[in-house]
């Protein structure tokens, strides 16, 4: 197992390495392509700028050429006027002016053609340069390594175990029997052109046997022929109910409209498209054909055809599906008043149950919320008790520490503490003095808001000062008491330690 795990880990590491290499290669290729695109864009911009500059120079040259022509025309016009004013001199020929204009237009057209040819040559040159660059890039690219392993690896055999489908012996036997019957019946079919179209008729030799025993007809449904019983078809709604053979013989014409109406209703309810070509044989031997109307909607396939295809795909060989007998649509139009009342009662019961369930859920949520509140309050009370206990213990420890410090305190240390406190008191006095000066400065502020703010700050500082003074007085009195107590203890010890000799003293002498 450990070896397999090692091999799997190695394979995964190799796969990750290949994936990282492929990613690096793709990133490098993208960077190269981006760089080449940027270079090409820069070159295009440079070429366009050069073309624009050349066009500007050409336009300037053409303007310069056109300016002298205009000046010449301007000079010619006063000359014409002079010529006209002189009565003895004849005017110049207007043909010379038109020739000059034509020559100027021809020169301009030639210059434009030259410019266009130069631009075309530049475009061709640019395209050839790009082709050469692309060929160089293709030559510089590394050849593709076909031997390198790819990221995805597929096994030759994806499925390890293949189980053959189960074969149902009974269904296969029924299928083969139906096929044999169908083959025997199809051999007896003949085609007649009585109604102007191809109708399949069943020619039976033994008419009496067919009427008395089988009473089956051949049905064509979606290109498949099936032998069905007349009672089954009548129960489905394709044919009217059959009581006996005489009724079918006496009323052959009533069969067509009823069956057509029933077929149309069947297509509306079940959305099925089935063509039934049936022949019923009377005692005289005259065939009677049943030709239903075509369905209204042929877009949707019948449910029986879908289920039959699924059964073939699954391996079941039932030739006829059971869904052909049962209509999938349940409409309330066919219900009786009693059934409608029962249905209403059932709906009311369902609504009542739903309301009760919602009410029960709401009550459960309220109960849970109440329980949670009780638990939270108990937890909060417990926490408060714990905090109070901790504070009590901390206060007792602080008192013990203070007592131990007072007993073991040194006079020099006490003097240092006294000096420190004095220094702190002096600092506080200085701060209070500065604050007082600031208050005096703030007193001259304009507006009520500044005065109110200053008054509030002054009150706050006064309270702080008062509390500090009270604390200092308490500390001083406590220290004085402790010092008096200690001095008494020292005096008592000194008095007891003195060794007085036992002697008689006469206080009266």
UniProtKB/Swiss-Prot annotation:
It comes from the Eukaryota. It is found in: Cytoplasm, Cytoskeleton; Cell projection, Cilium, Flagellum. Residues 58-82 have a biased composition (Basic and acidic residues). InterPro entries: CCDC181 (IPR026687). Keywords: Cell projection, Cilium, Coiled coil, Cytoplasm, Cytoskeleton, Flagellum, Microtubule. Residues 243-266, 300-332 have a biased composition (Polar residues). Residues 335-375 form a coiled coil. One of its GO terms (cellular component) is manchette. One of its GO terms (molecular function) is microtubule binding. Its main location: cytoplasm. Residues 58-120, 241-332, 345-367 are annotated as: Disordered. Belongs to the CCDC181 family. Microtubule-binding protein that localizes to the microtubular manchette of elongating spermatids. PANTHER family: COILED-COIL DOMAIN-CONTAINING PROTEIN 181. Homodimer. Interacts with HOOK1. Interacts with HOOK2. Interacts with HOOK3. This is Coiled-coil domain-containing protein 181. It comes from Pongo abelii.
């Amino acid at each position: 197992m450990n070896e397999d795990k090692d091999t799997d880990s190695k394979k995964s590491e190799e796969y990750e390495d290949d994936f990282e290499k492929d990613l690096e290669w793709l990133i490098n290729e993208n960077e190269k392509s981006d760089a080449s695109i940027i270079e090409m864009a820069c070159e295009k911009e440079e070429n366009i700028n050069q073309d624009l500059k050349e066009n500007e120079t050409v336009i300037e040259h053409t303007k310069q050429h056109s300016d002298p022509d205009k000046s010449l025309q301007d000079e010619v016009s006063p000359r014409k006027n002079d010529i006209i004013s002189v009565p003895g001199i004849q005017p110049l020929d207007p043909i010379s002016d038109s020739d000059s204009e034509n020559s100027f237009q021809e020169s301009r057209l030639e210059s434009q053609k030259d410019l266009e040819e130069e631009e075309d040559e530049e475009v061709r040159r640019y395209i050839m340069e790009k082709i050469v660059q692309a060929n160089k890039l293709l030559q510089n690219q590394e050849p593709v390594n076909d031997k390198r392993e790819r990221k995805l690896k597929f096994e030759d055999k994806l499925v390890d175990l293949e189980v053959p489908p189960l074969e149902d012996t009974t269904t296969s036997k029924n299928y083969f029997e139906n096929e044999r019957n169908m083959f025997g019946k199809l051999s007896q079919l003949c085609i007649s052109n009585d109604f102007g179209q191809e109708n399949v008729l069943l020619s039976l030799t033994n008419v009496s046997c067919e009427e008395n025993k089988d009473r089956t007809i051949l049905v064509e449904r979606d290109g498949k022929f099936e032998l069905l019983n007349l009672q089954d078809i009548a129960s489905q709604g394709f044919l009217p109910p059959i009581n006996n053979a005489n009724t079918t013989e006496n009323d052959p014409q009533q069969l067509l409209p009823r069956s057509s109406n029933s077929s149309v209703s069947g297509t509306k309810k079940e959305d099925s498209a089935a063509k039934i070509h049936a022949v019923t044989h009377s005692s005289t031997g005259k065939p009677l054909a049943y030709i239903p109307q075509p369905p209204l909607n042929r877009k949707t396939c019948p449910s029986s055809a879908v289920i039959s295809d699924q059964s073939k795909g699954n391996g079941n060989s039932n030739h006829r599906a059971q869904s052909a007998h049962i209509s999938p649509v349940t409409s309330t139009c066919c219900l009786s008043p009693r059934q409608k009342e029962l249905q209403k009662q059932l709906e009311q019961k369902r609504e009542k149950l739903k309301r009760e369930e919602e009410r029960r859920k709401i009550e459960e949520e309220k109960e849970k919320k109440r329980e949670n509140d009780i638990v939270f309050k108990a937890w909060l009370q417990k926490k408060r008790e714990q905090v109070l206990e901790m504070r009590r213990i901390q206060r007792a420890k602080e008192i013990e520490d203070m007592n131990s410090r007072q007993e073991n305190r040194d006079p020099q240390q006490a003097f240092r503490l006294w000096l420190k406190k004095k220094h702190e008191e002096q600092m506080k006095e200085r701060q209070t003095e500065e604050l007082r000066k600031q208050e005096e400065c703030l007193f001259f502020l304009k507006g009520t808001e500044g005065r109110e703010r200053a008054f509030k700050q002054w009150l706050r500082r006064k309270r702080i000062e008062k509390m500090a003074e009270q604390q200092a007085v308490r500390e001083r009195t406590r220290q004085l008491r402790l010092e008096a107590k200690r001095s008494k203890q020292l005096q008592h010890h000194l008095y007891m330690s003195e060794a007085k000799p036992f002697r008689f003293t006469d206080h009266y002498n």
